[in-house]
UniProtKB/Swiss-Prot annotation:
Belongs to the SPARC family. This is SPARC. SMART domains: FOLN (SM00274), KAZAL (SM00280). Glycans are attached at N118. It is found in: Secreted, Extracellular space, Extracellular matrix, Basement membrane. Residues 263-273 form the EF-hand domain.
Length: 273
């Protein structure tokens, strides 16, 4: 758990230092079982989980020329992941597949992504550009981004481990909130309302000493502090339930949390199935 907290602290620190980039909207064509495409780490909004990534956050900010003779028709013409805007012979904007070789060179390992066919791509830009060239094919239809980071061996999730996953997830979300609270001195990592809720969690963090406790004691503690236990889950749910806000989480909405967790927690894929 200490390693996870250290990892989260590093991500939160990097989120504060990173320049804000423009986010891309979700890809329009998504198979129900596929995961939404995920990318480079953008600046984390106030009150957001630093491990949760934004869909399309790998997009490079479009450069603008200092001297613009006429408005570029492509300026406000959106293209989905893997495509770029070009003008046809009538000066009409159109979306075409991006050449993978035109993608920016990766800075480090953290930019690499793994596809569901276990192939590592240098960045999400390279992945989406490659997927675009396969549009209309069976392979392209099935291909999607699986998780962030280079492909690695992920051991199978045992039934006993899967049954414990919700508790690990709840505790992990709680630890994320507590870590953000402890580092929130003027950094605006949490909203004022969130700070008040997490303050209670922080103050009660050590009400039970580590060790084995009777089930009855743990049950009473859970009932007494129910709101404290469920707030981290509600906090994360509220961040993900956005498109649309309907009280349900689709595979697309879960993707920003799922993709960065898979390399760290091998039961993630099975839990979110």
């Amino acid at each position: 758990m200490k390693a996870w907290i250290f990892f989260l602290v590093c991500l939160a620190g990097r989120a504060l230092a990173a320049p804000q980039q423009e986010a891309l909207p979700d890809e329009t064509e998504v198979v129900e079982e596929t995961v939404a495409e995920v990318a480079e780490v953008a600046e984390v909004p106030v009150g957001a989980n630093p491990v949760q990534v934004e869909v399309g956050e790998f997009e490079e900010v479009e450069e603008t020329e200092e001297e613009v003779v006429a408005e570029n028709p492509c300026q406000n013409h959106h293209c989905k992941h893997g495509k770029v805007c070009e003008l046809d012979e009538n000066n009409t904007p159109m979306c075409v597949c991006q050449d993978p070789t035109s993608c920016p060179a990766p800075v480090g390992e953290f930019e690499k992504v793994c596809s569901n066919d276990n192939k590592t791509f240098d960045s999400s830009c390279h992945f989406f550009a490659t997927k675009c060239t396969l549009e209309g094919t069976k392979k392209g239809h099935k291909l999607h981004l699986d998780y962030i980071g280079p492909c690695k061996y992920i051991p199978p999730c045992l039934d006993s481990e899967l049954s414990e996953f919700p508790l690990r997830m709840r505790d992990w979300l709680k630890n994320v909130l507590v870590t953000l609270y402890e580092r929130d001195e003027g950094n605006n990592l949490l909203t004022e309302k969130q700070k008040l809720r997490v303050k209670k969690i922080h103050e009660n963090e050590k009400r039970l000493e580590a060790g084995d406790h009777p089930v009855e004691l743990l049950a009473r503690d859970f009932e007494k502090n129910y709101n404290m236990y469920i707030f981290p889950v509600h906090w994360q749910f509220g961040q993900l339930d956005q498109h649309p806000i309907d009280g349900y989480l689709s595979h697309t909405e879960l993707a920003p949390l799922r993709a960065p967790l898979i390399p760290m927690e091998h039961c993630t894929t099975r839990f979110f199935e």
